[in-house]
């Protein structure tokens, strides 16, 4: 910048001796025609050369800086390709680089200003005759150009500082992300190790559970087999008991069928007994003298009574067996008939005992009541 300023300062110094030239021109009007035209042209040409050299030097420096920036950008791009997860941050940096491209476009606009300046120089060469009036305008324009170049250089310094700061921030962010990624990878490795250990534990526990379940199933099968064997034995016993009960039922039915004719015989003998009792009552008065015969007859009657009692006991046993087997209503009818038979037997016993005591009259009255029944 100091060299640019030193190159820009000779401009007004070259223009300073012009008043002397004016005075000389006034003194020597003949020499003004050649020397007066040569000095402004050389000064302006030197100024234009100095400005072009300064601009070329600035552009060269900026091109070197931009080459460095491009190298750094390429390095950043290679690093960003390794970290695909940081595309968002790279997009931010690319947006910042686009802003730098805008600044480059502004620099190109400054170059277009240089072309305009050259056009102005050519116009100045045409208007050398009017240079006396346009010196102030030229100095003002030079000052404006110096200010513009100063502003451009300051802007480039700021942009370079911002880019350096951005690269430093990006490096720090890359380091942070790299550390975070490494931490995540380490945590993932630890989780994978813990999961593998858990899987091993689960496999061992499943094997143990399978063994225990197989043992329990075998024990359950043995228990079921034992229960089945015991159940089969119980079923066999029940079948045997059923067969015995069926045989007993057949025996009881046979006995019942064998006792039925005896009962019929008893029923058949009951009217004869009743007739005999009536005949005894009728001839009781005639038979008082024949007590021996009556005693014999009573003995026979007692024997017959014993037989009847035996028959009654057998009938009672049959009744008990019939109640256990629970036959139909025919058995109930037979029970009723047996009850009537028992009543008649008891009446006969009472009659025989009354006859012995000499109470035949009372017994006859009672017998009439039973006949009415």
Swiss-Prot record:
Endoplasmic reticulum found in the keyword field? yes
Where does it live in the cell?
Endoplasmic reticulum membrane
Which UniProt keywords are given for this protein, alphabetically ordered? Answer: Coiled coil, Endoplasmic reticulum, Glycoprotein, Membrane, Transmembrane, Transmembrane helix
Glycosylation is annotated at 151
Kindly list any coiled-coil regions of this protein: 86-257, 285-324
Biased composition, class Basic and acidic residues, residue ranges: 18-33
Transmembrane residue ranges: 43-59
Q: Region Disordered: what ranges?
A: 1-38
Keyword Cell wall biogenesis/degradation belongs to the record: no
Which residue stretches does the UniProt record annotate as biased composition, category Basic residues? 1-11
Q: What modifications follow translation?
A: N-glycosylated at Asn-151.
Q: How does it sit in the membrane?
A: Single-pass membrane protein
GO-annotated cellular components: endoplasmic reticulum; endoplasmic reticulum membrane
Which biological processes are named by the entry's GO terms? response to interleukin-1; response to lipopolysaccharide; response to tumor necrosis factor
* Described function: Target of p53/TP53 with pro-apoptotic function.
Additional remark text:
Shares a common promoter with APAF1 from which the 2 genes are transcribed in opposite directions.
Q: What is this protein called?
A: Inhibitor of nuclear factor kappa-B kinase-interacting protein
Q: Which organism is it from?
A: Mus musculus (Mouse)
């Amino acid at each position: 910048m100091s060299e640019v300023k030193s190159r820009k300062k000779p401009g007004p110094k070259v223009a300073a001796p012009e008043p002397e030239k004016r005075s000389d021109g006034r003194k020597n009007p003949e020499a003004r025609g050649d020397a007066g035209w040569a000095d402004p042209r050389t000064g302006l040409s030197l100024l234009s050369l100095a400005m072009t050299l300064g601009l070329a030097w600035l552009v060269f420096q900026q091109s070197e800086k931009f080459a460095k920036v491009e190298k750094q950008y390429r390095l950043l791009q290679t690093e960003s390709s390794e970290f695909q997860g940081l595309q968002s941050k790279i997009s931010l940096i690319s947006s910042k680089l686009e802003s730098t491209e805008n600044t480059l476009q502004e620099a190109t606009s400054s170059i277009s200003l240089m072309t305009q300046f050259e056009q102005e120089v050519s116009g100045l060469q045409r208007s050398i005759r009017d240079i006396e009036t346009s010196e102030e305008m030229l100095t003002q324009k030079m000052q404006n150009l110096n200010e513009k170049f100063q502003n451009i250089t300051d802007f480039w310094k700021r942009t370079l500082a911002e880019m350096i700061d951005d690269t430093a921030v990006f490096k720090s962010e890359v380091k942070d992300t790299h550390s975070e990624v490494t931490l995540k990878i380490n945590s993932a490795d630890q989780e994978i190790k813990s999961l593998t250990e858990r899987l091993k534990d689960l496999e061992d526990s499943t094997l143990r559970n399978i063994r225990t379940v197989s043992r329990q199933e075998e024990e359950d099968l043995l228990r079921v087999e034992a229960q089945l064997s015991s159940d089969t034995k119980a079923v066999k016993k029940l079948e045997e008991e059923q067969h015995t009960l069926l045989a007993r039922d057949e025996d009881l039915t046979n006995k019942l069928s064998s006792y039925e004719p005896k009962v019929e015989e008893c029923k058949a003998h009951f009217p004869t007994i009743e007739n005999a009792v009536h005949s005894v009552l009728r001839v009781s008065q005639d038979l008082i003298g024949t007590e021996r015969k009556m005693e014999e007859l009573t003995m026979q009657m007692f024997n017959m009574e014993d037989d009847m009692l035996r028959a009654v006991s057998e009938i009672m046993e049959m009744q008990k067996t019939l109640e256990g087997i629970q036959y139909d209503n025919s058995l109930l009818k037979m029970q009723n008939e047996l009850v009537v038979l028992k009543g008649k037997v008891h009446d006969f016993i009472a009659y025989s005992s009354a006859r012995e005591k000499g109470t035949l009259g009372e017994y006859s009255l009672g017998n009439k009541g039973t006949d009415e029944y």
